[in-house]
Amino acid sequence: MQESTPVITIDGPSGAGKGTVARIVADQLGWHLLDSGAIYRVLAVAIQHHQLSLDDEEPLIPMAAHLDVQFEINSQGEAKVILEGENVTEIIRTEEVGGLASKVAAFPRVREALLRRQRAFSVSPGLIADGRDMGTVVFPKAPVKIFLTASAEERADRRFNQLKEKGIDVNIGRLLDDIRQRDERDQNRKVAPLIPAEGALTIDSTDISITEVVNKILMFANGKLT
């Protein structure tokens, strides 16, 4: 990691729009992108592939430390996630993997093992780091910190529509319950709870467009970086 490399962190709960916003901001600035949530999901898939149990943290640590993951961007600006040579882009976005990733993220030593890997993404000309503890733990000295949120109902609705477009039949009530449970787990865990970083700009995306969110971030960043 280069200490002088500027970093913009975008934290927030699942479904707030962090991934979409982060990709757009990274594209407009010509910076690198880190999807921290994807790394935890990739680790969750790796744990499944290697048939490891969540009852014991110990064997998960070396897997996290040596996780063979790559991020590739296609011509449409979409991220492709490669685990051990396999394209797991779609697999890691399932609700099952998302729930497992949240549980994996609660292990302190697993988080520590992934910490250096995430920080290694900070290279010139700059990095957009999307996650849940980017501004509080991974890049605490980042000059620009964003906390992006939205109501649980709005986030459930967005997820429902995403899955519906893919032909996946889901119950929106169950989605809402899952989101609320995940919020409670993430906000109350002892290690790296989901909270706004000190000095972060909080943006509620419930009733505003992606373009408006991006513009708010770029204006805030411009004031911090110039």
Curated annotation (Swiss-Prot):
NCBIfam families: cmk. The keyword Nucleotide-binding applies. GO terms for molecular function: ATP binding; CMP kinase activity; dCMP kinase activity. Its main location: cytoplasm. Keywords: ATP-binding, Cytoplasm, Kinase, Nucleotide-binding, Transferase. SUPFAM superfamilies: P-loop containing nucleoside triphosphate hydrolases. Pfam families: Cytidylate_kin. Its EC number is 2.7.4.25. GO terms for cellular component: cytosol. Belongs to the cytidylate kinase family. Type 1 subfamily. It catalyses: CMP + ATP = CDP + ADP; dCMP + ATP = dCDP + ADP. Gene3D superfamilies: P-loop containing nucleotide triphosphate hydrolases. This is Cytidylate kinase. It is found in: Cytoplasm. ATP binds at residues 12-20. GO terms for biological process: nucleobase-containing small molecule interconversion; pyrimidine nucleotide metabolic process. InterPro entries: Cytidylate_kin, Cytidylate_kinase_dom, P-loop_NTPase. It comes from Colwellia psychrerythraea (strain 34H / ATCC BAA-681).
